[in-house]
Amino acid sequence: MVRVTLTASAGVMLEADGLRFLVDALHSEGEYPFSRVPEKLLAEMDTGRGPFCNADYLVFTHDHPDHYTPQVVERYLRHNRVRRVLLPRVQWADRETELLRYLAEEAIPWWRLGMPRGTAHSYQLQPGVFLTAIGMQHTGAGFAELDCDCIVLQVNGKNFLFTADCDYLRREAYSFAKGLPWEAVFVNPYFYHSGTGQVLLRDVLQPKHIVVYHIPFAGEDPMGLRALAHQDQVKYAASLPQTVFLTEYLQQSTWD
């Protein structure tokens, strides 16, 4: 069984083969035009009970406030036990001072991701479970100097690809994905909307499932991404693999 649950924006919990991964799922800061993880969910995590508590792995693609808040990660770790934390490359080192101190004090295992652009590194998380971080350019002209990790999770033979904010205009950057059997590929609305993104999804990645995420909640969407996603859902549904659009708080998608 595979289940995906939205926390907010590009934050999801992936459940596969009895393991739970929180990917970009712990953030609540900044003035970005994307939804924060609601305080009521963070408070539930503080109880140490419920579906989001005691996740196996915390994974972060890059150090942007709509993907990663060190203080929220530390808060989570004070109330929950995890096997390992996989941190992004930092843009502002002082953001992590307290988190790194807590990781050291509590001897919580962690690794630093954030691969240089065009390089990749694989980590074995446990037998049969691997994470590969692939350094890519961040999408958007205003962020072209920044990098973002494209994350591959391999869970006992099932392959999941999290593209987060990785650039999708250079098809060759995804040559690593050609021919792999993808259980699910996670893309943002701009990736899904673009012609190059469509080619990647249809001809290169060819996943069983497409998950479109990084969509603001209703009332928190100044850029109109919800309307764009709805338009594209109608336009492309028949020509692409099974697609789910994560637009609502705690929305889930489950499949065998």
Predicted regions mapped to residue ranges:
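Core dinuclear metal-dependent hydrolase active-site scaffold
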Residues: M1-C53, W110-L180, E248-D256
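Active-site environment of divalent metal-dependent phosphoester hydrolases
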Residues: A10, E29-G30, D63-P70, W92-R95, ...
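Active-site neighborhood of phospho(di)ester-bond hydrolases with catalytic His/Asp-centered motifs
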Residues: V23-D24, N54-D66, L86-R89, L161-C166, ...
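Active-site metal-binding motif and surrounding structural segment of the metallo-beta-lactamase
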Residues: R36-W92, K178-F186, Q206
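A general structural detector for well-ordered alpha-helical segments in enzyme core domains, enriched
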Residues: Y76, D147-D149, E172-F176, G197-L201, ...
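Binuclear metal-ion centers of metallo-dependent hydrolases, dominated by the metallo-beta-lactamase
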Residues: L99-V129, F176, V199-D256
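A short, conserved beta-to-alpha structural element at the edge of catalytic cores
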Residues: A184-D203
